[in-house]
Amino acid sequence: IHPETGLPIAPERFGWTSVFAREIARIARADPTVVGITAAMTRPVGLGRFADEFPDRVIDVGIAEQHAMTMAAGLARAGMRPVLALYSTFMNRGFDQLIMDVALHREPVTVVLDRAGITGDDGASHNGVWDLSIAAMVPGLRTAAPRDGEELAALLREALAHDGPALLRYPKGALPEPIPALSSHSWGDVLFSGERPEVAVVAVGSMVPVALEAAGRSDVPVRVLDPRWALPVADGLVDELMSGYRGVVTVEDGLVDGGVGSEIALALARAGYTGGQAHIGVRREFLDHRTRASALAREGMTADDVLSGISAAGRADGPALLRPRGARSA
């Protein structure tokens, strides 16, 4: 792990963007209905290889995310399978079109968001922390967050096979080592399980390694769950969380207010869950310009913070919403 970025150290060819670039080109060779769309960022978002091989099937609309989203909806209506690739922070510009042109009509558009979550020294405006909260409020939109390169490739194919809109998000930087599942279910994967686990940790995408580190150090027996398709929250995941855990912890690289943690808390409330809860993610505030590692520490999103959440949720005697606090002065 790089001490400044908080990301795995690996050559660029093993980065998230490179995996997407290889996989979308491979898919495009086999399916002529797949087209790529981007907003003045063909190579930064990983569509360069696709464009080199099929220049008439990759469209760069310029700095016009609203137009890109509407064009994707139109191409989908015409029978194509558009893949709209953006930086996460720039999807905000196409929010209205995502709702009214794509989701309202259930068009099979796949939105791929690079640099999702805390990006660190790209600058305050480039932190992609809004997408999960945005996606959570859009009816019919499925949202996936891969934990490693193999999952990125698999989820991209699942998104393109879906008969409605789908969103795929992943962070900037290098990939972790492959993270195998202990078992797979309709709602996602079990990645770690202590003996007679008392606390369930739901880890989203790039936060899976952080959750696994905390689980390995925890004195409280823990089970780590990866929902894969994080939104909407699957009924099967709620059933799993209602199956006897004393506490539930969620960890996501995005706004915790309105994001996956909030959606899980609401689902558990509706189901009558009475255990403790801790929801870890970015606060509802603008992040300043700092390294990713520093931002994670400031926001209370490190393995130590997850450990604190496990401890607090596991010992709660009744329904309680708990959130570990980071070092705000860092």
Language-model features: locations:
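Thiamine diphosphate
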Residues: 2-52, 60, 66-69, 104-127, ...
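Phosphate/diphosphate-binding loops
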Residues: 80-170
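Extended, hydrophobic alpha-helical segments in both membrane/secreted and soluble proteins
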Residues: 46, 58, 65-85, 94-98, ...
